[in-house]
């Protein structure tokens, strides 16, 4: 077939057989939408039980199979060269699903949506395809794949990707307040990495090329985040640990926001309470502290720390290796005159060499700003600001005169 092939409204058939079809220059579409049975707003075909394409070797486009309620086995796609495969509302397709012999030619996606009986998906080690898994009730393991073009996961259930090492594009684990994701072998994400699930585990992850975002869907279990090996985030590190009553722990992290054009999950004004609050390239909300003992450089728009509503146990900010912040260094509590005041008492930056600007608010117990004396000569009255609601609010002239702490 020189271009695409489309078969719709085939409700009168039990079998669709194309025994000599070998190559298709575009897409193959089997789309059923005529029967009265509906799932998720889509009408289902309850007649077709079998689709045969046993001679198929190559599809230059995507194979679409949509809304066949009684289809139990796939056409012979394991071994085909194809751009993409999209399987939607095939509620009786039997487990397991094996694409280990399929060659994905690039630029497409492997989409599974509402596949109610599939528990295990097996893929080739090198798969030039974006894998999208959406609302599959039982799917709990994706095996075989070592490298993907991209990955999107919407629960579903808990899922593990035991062999996955590299994703060349974006990864999104989304809308999963009750589920966990495990990627025990993942080493590198070249695009963005979004975490919006209950638990996440990246024990071998060393680098994220774009932004790394962790939302407040993450569990209050202190072990719900594992970034023990992470060295570099090229874009924004956005971490909302509202529900994590433990320090943000990244013991090997050295640099954030240092890509040539850093990607941001959130940017611009974070001004719900303070009109001058912003999202930096290292934008953190933490109740219980930071463990960044090796962080050397923050590029892009700078380092911003939100201390929440004053409910934190965060008393000491120690960034012992931090040398450079290209943009702003900002700390704020979520709202002026909030009670109790943020408990932050000390800031330690023993090797700091460069900061673009300083802006600190809402820290009623903070009375010593000596950490900034090594860089005060780089600043001026416009780039130095400490709000009067802090325990001590030295002006730029105070700092220039060496009056960095409350007497």
Predicted features along the sequence, with ranges:
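Sequence contexts marking disulfide-bonded cysteines in secreted/extracellular proteins
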Residues: 7, 158-160, 224-226, 281-283, ...
